[in-house]
């Protein structure tokens, strides 16, 4: 591989790194929402897989059945995190051309 090709490849990698850094910043602002129990529990997560909001309909709060509410919260959180990860994977593929980078 000639030096010209090596320099070109290095520039492409630097450009990709800058795009990834910009995307990571943007993903902190993008959100996905998931719900469980017909919408009585709603969870919002950002592209960094951080929960940013949880809403629970007061009708879902039954002191006699706390376990049901816990299950609904878990289901909504897991779905929101799954959607968030899918969003990250899609956006990273646009930059990397489906090259898997560590940590994404």
UniProtKB/Swiss-Prot annotation:
Main location: cytoplasm
The keyword Cytoplasm belongs to this UniProt entry's keyword annotation: yes
GO cellular component: bacterial nucleoid; cytosol
SUPFAM superfamilies xrefs: YbaB-like (SSF82607)
Entry keyword set: Cytoplasm, DNA-binding
Coiled-coil residue windows: none
Subcellular location: Cytoplasm, Nucleoid
Family per similarity comment: Belongs to the YbaB/EbfC family.
Protein purpose: Binds to DNA and alters its conformation. May be involved in regulation of gene expression, nucleoid organization and DNA protection.
Subunit structure: Homodimer.
Protein name in the entry: Nucleoid-associated protein Moth_0028
């Amino acid at each position: 591989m000639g030096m010209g090709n090596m320099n070109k490849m290095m520039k492409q990698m630097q450009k990709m790194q800058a795009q990834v850094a910009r995307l990571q910043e943007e993903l902190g602002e993008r959100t996905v929402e998931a719900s469980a129990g017909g919408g009585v529990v709603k969870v919002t997560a950002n592209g960094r897989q951080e929960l940013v909001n949880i809403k629970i309909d007061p009708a879902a709060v039954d002191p006699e059945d706390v376990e049901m509410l816990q299950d609904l919260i878990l289901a909504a959180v897991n779905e929101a995190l799954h959607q968030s990860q899918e969003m990250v994977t899609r956006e990273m593929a646009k930059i990397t051309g489906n090259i898997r980078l560590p940590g994404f």
